[in-house]
Amino acid sequence: MNNLNDPPNWNIRPNSRADGGDGSRWNYALLVPMLGLAAFRWIWSRESQKEIEKEKEACRQRTAAFQRDLEARYHATISESRRAVARLSLELEKEQNRTTSYREALISQGRKMVEEKKLLEQERAQVLQEKRQPLRSAYLSCLDKEADWQRRARLLLREFEEALAERQSIYCSLVLPRGRRLDIEKGLLVRASTDPLAVDLEMAAGLSDIFKHDTHCGGVWNTSKRQNGRLMWLYLQYWELVVELKKFKRVEKAILEK
């Protein structure tokens, strides 16, 4: 029987007799399978290594392709963002230039009206000096009448100013309803077309210009309505000058008719 406590001597223990022939045959019989097993493991290790390297290369190529795709998408997104920023910057610059042109035109018109007012005042002073005595009472009477017209015109402008400030505040707000702003704009246009004083001041065209081009807002944390809008304040100053100029023209017309 086999000695379980001595594994090297299981059934294959060479004969220790003097001739020794059977023991050598058993040793060679064990050597051949062991060499075959070693060769198989070597070949299997090489093939496995080749497969591993092949998979590594395929994984590397897939990773590189994925990385190239991500980089291409990233650069495309960056390019599109830059084009969008450039386009918005150009539109903003155009809008600013347009607003500047309107402001300069209004300032120029205002200066012209101031000059006309000065000329009218000079002409009026000259007329009064030449016809002081007979025209003094008539001039003062006409001036009193036109002062009442001027007061009503200025009151009208104050009402329009409040409505425009409210309209611009709604325009700049992120929460106030757009419908309320449209109602204010519609009401102002209707009044500018029906109120005799507003018609005399030709306010309808200016209001349409304001509603179309005045997009200035004071800022996110702004709480003052007077910091919103630019074009509207220029038009209000312009209408003030128109009121002053028309008052003197009305006085002049009344005196000449007499």
Swiss-Prot record:
Domain of life assignment: Eukaryota
Keyword Coiled coil among record annotations: yes
Keywords: Coiled coil
UniProt cross-references to InterPro entries, sorted A to Z: CCDC127
Coiled coil: 50-170
Keyword field contains Coiled coil: yes
PANTHER family named in the record: COILED-COIL DOMAIN-CONTAINING PROTEIN 127
This protein's name: Coiled-coil domain-containing protein 127
Organism this protein belongs to: Sus scrofa
